Amino acid sequence: PTRVGASCVLVAIGIVPSTSLAESAGLDIDDGVLVDRAQRTSNPAIFAVGDAARHRTADGMLLRRHEHWESAMNHGRTAAAALLGVDLPKLGSSWFWSDRYGVHVEGVGSMLAPGRDVVRAVDGIPQVAFRVSDDNLLVGCAAIDDSHAVRAARRIIDRKIVVDDDALADPTISLKGKSFRTR
C-alpha cells in the first residue's frame, strides 16, 4: 500500500446511475431511466424508482434525478398506486439535506427555476437563499444550519403561497407568520 500524507482529503465520488439493465430492455435512458409521473418507463409494463429514475414531464421536459431516500420512498408509493389503479399520492416538493464538515445544508424545490434570488442574512451573513418565480411564488430554498427555514419554505412552496421579497429577506419575520398564509 502507498501512503500519502495530507491534512485534508476531498473524496468526490459522484453519482452515475447504473442503467445497463434498463438499456438492454430497450427503455428510454438519459442520465437515468426516464419515467412519467406514475414512475412508468417507456415500456408501460415496467416501472422504475429510486436514484436511477428521472422524470420526463408530459410536455417532454426532463427533470433532474432526486438522489434522496425520501424520493425513493415516494417513487415506490407512486408506482404502487399506479399498479393498483388508484389515485397517485400528492407529494411535497423535493428535499435534501447533508452534513459536511460541521455544517448542515438543506434545500427544497428548485433553485434553478426561472425567477429571482432573495437572500436572508443573519448578522450580515447569508444564511438562507430563496428562489421566487415571476408570479411571486416561492419555488426553491437553500439554507445553511437552518432546517426550520427549509421546512417552512416547503410548506409555502407546496401550498403555492404568494410571497413578498422583503418579508423573505427579513430574519425578524417568521416564515410561519401571517405574512405567509394562503390568500
Segments (PLM) and residue ranges:
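Short, positively charged
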Residues: 1, 13, 51, 108-113, ...
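Mid-to-C-terminal Rossmann-like scaffold of FAD/NAD(P)H-dependent oxidoreductases
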Residues: 52-148, 155
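A short, polar/charged loop-to-alpha-helix boundary motif
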Residues: 147-165
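Cysteine/selenocysteine-centered motifs that mediate thiol-based redox chemistry or coordinate metal-sulfur cofactors
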Residues: 162-183
